[in-house]
């Protein structure tokens, strides 16, 4: 395999990929708007509920929506009463805008660059509309606090996109009070500021 790193955002990278596909006749496996990718990511939902069968809710980052789509389908298939909350950064609320018919600005850089997606998926948008209970937006300061808390309290190094679930819990503790809650914490792809 030939790995090429190109672009600061997913959108910039996708523009480069489209050019390469035209030039070289390559096949695109979409990173989130693909049924097989969503199906694979659903195994995380199964693992959550096999490990902790009495979960009341899951809090999942949203970029293009593949991860939360797979997890939501799997989790609600096992436990239809489980609540699924999606988390986006206030700087990139693309899926939030789509589902809530809002026009919040999508702009700037974010510490949660792993979920900095300007255009949500069509397949994922439909799934999220049917399976996700709500989307919570978190700001940069809230994400930074979550990253710090994860490191200081648990010695977990998480990138911004991986810490947004914890940011949502810290932002809205009353929403999750008394609930068995799970979140995905991932990625050590973070630079010191």
Question: Where are the regions a protein language model picked out?
Answer:
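PLP-dependent amino-acid enzyme catalytic core
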Residues: 1-193
């Amino acid at each position: 395999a030939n790995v090429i790193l190109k672009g600061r955002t997913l959108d910039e990278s996708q523009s480069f990929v489209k050019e390469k596909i035209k030039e070289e006749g390559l096949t695109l496996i979409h990173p989130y708007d693909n049924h097989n990718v969503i199906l694979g990511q659903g195994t995380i939902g199964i693992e959550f509920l096999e490990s902790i069968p009495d979960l009341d809710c899951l809090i999942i980052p949203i970029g293009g929506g593949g991860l939360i789509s797979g997890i939501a389908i799997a989790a609600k298939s096992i436990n239809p009463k489980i609540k699924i909350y999606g988390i986006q950064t206030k700087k990139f609320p693309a899926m939030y805008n789509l589902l809530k018919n809002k026009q919040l600005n999508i702009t700037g850089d974010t510490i949660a660059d792993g979920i900095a997606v300007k255009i949500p998926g069509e397949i994922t948008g439909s799934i999220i509309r049917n399976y996700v209970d709500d989307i919570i937006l978190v700001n940069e300061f809230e994400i930074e606090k979550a990253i710090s808390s994860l490191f200081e309290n648990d010695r977990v190094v998480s990138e911004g996109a991986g810490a947004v679930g914890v940011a949502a819990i810290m932002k809205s503790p009353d929403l999750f009070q008394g609930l068995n809650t799970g979140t995905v914490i991932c990625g050590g792809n973070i630079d010191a500021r």
